[in-house]
Amino acid sequence: MRKLLLFGAFFIALAAGGQGAPGKFDGTWNTTVTCDPAGGTLGYTLHFVSTVTGNVLHGDRGTPGQQAYLAIDGKIANDGKAKLTASGVTASSQYTHGPSKTEGQDYSYEVKSQFTDTEGKGERTTGMGIVGRPCHYTFEKQAANAAAANP
């Protein structure tokens, strides 16, 4: 009977939201995006915080649906490889590269990335370079006590 109660308690705890062990890359990451100037378009650098939970990364900057919004999302494999998706809304036309330089347009692209326990690097996939331009991502994991101090 005691084993049955312990077994039942385990499944109740699991059903109540037990998530299992944390992912290898879980934590708070300082994220920097640098997009090179291209074809008369200005370059830029953005800084924001991304969070990894269960080896799934999410970071964003700005207000969803508004100009200059950027979100990056994706799963990091156990070997540190990740194909992340960056999506957002274009900013001023002076920073928007490609044939359609309209402000306020939705966009998305992939970021091929590699993570270690403490850092990561990624590159925007640019295809033939007609629409995309080189963008470089760096990720630096915050120490656990630094993440707690910066909610």
Residue ranges of predicted features:
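Sec-dependent N-terminal signal peptides
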Residues: 4-13
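Amphipathic alpha-helical interaction segments
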Residues: 12-15, 36-38
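Boundary at the C-terminal end of the N-terminal hydrophobic targeting segment
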Residues: 16-20
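Central antiparallel beta-sheet cores of small beta-barrel/beta-sandwich binding domains
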Residues: 22-116, 121-151
